[in-house]
Amino acid sequence: MKSVQRHILFAATIALCLISCRHQAAPEPAEPQALSEYSEPSVPSKNSEPSTLSNPSNLSNPSNPSAPTSSPYAGGLEGVLASIPSSFVLLADVCPDIIQEIRYYTTYNFVGERIPGYERPVAYLTRQAADSLKLVCDDLKEQGYRLKVFDAYRPQMAVDFFVRWGSDLEDQRMKEYFYPDCPKSELFRRGYIAHKSGHTRGSTLDLTLFDMKTEREVDMGGTYDFLGETSHYNYSHGLTRDQINHRRILREAMMRHGFKPIAVEWWHFTLRNEPYPDHYFTFPIR
């Protein structure tokens, strides 16, 4: 009898334990771990030494120019816009007579490889800049010239790439052709390489004259994108009268129709009343 009572007592104890467990509150779920705050990439100060890159080919994949480029500056500029606004146009749609030789789509440039962001050899400009350039075309056609464009809108990703390339003092494969008289370590100080470019705002372009009679590019007394004094507009040492005159014809025609030049590059012009003076775009050229 006592044995039966012990078994009944044991069974009752087990039942009470089960009932108690069912009524216990489920533990509160753990608080999700907070995400760390996003911080903008830091831009090196003017006094800091640039980092040396051992292999510039790691910056981008030349066979796939749309591949993203790792850059300490990418996304760190105020006002960078990645989508193309409706006021940008293909230059060929507005000025079909213009010859386009987009150098940064090719390997014939001061870097020696296709530049990230240049996925097609075409030129984009803001509508305002393109319309003004059409007036320049009509003006010069009466003088027997066409325009030849080397670069127009330039994605910020390309500018970032130039900055990284400029910091790699070991890569000097194109020095003989584009900066033979300038140490690469001086390119930043002399203003040939910068963290920002007017091209990225969409109303700046690089161009030259094309002679309609000879069907040749006009001799300007210096090659496009040459990083040296011969590219300065007022450089005259060793230049012929025709070369100086050609520079003048291009500059005066551009200025008549609302473009402003710069002193250090005879080929570089920006629309005076550009629509995006404070924005730097980075959409790729497609």
Predicted segment positions?
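General helical secondary-structure elements
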Residues: K2-S3, L18, E37
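Compositionally biased, intrinsically disordered low-complexity segments enriched
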Residues: A30-A67
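Extracytoplasmic cell-surface/polysaccharide-interacting catalytic and binding patches
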Residues: C21-L35, P65-A152, V159-D160, R164-V264, ...
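Polybasic, lysine/arginine-rich low-complexity segments
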Residues: K2, R22, K46-E49
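Bacterial N-terminal signal peptides
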Residues: F10-I19
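Conserved metal-phosphate-binding beta-hairpin within the catalytic cores
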Residues: F269
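Bacterial N-terminal signal peptides that target proteins for export
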Residues: M1-L9
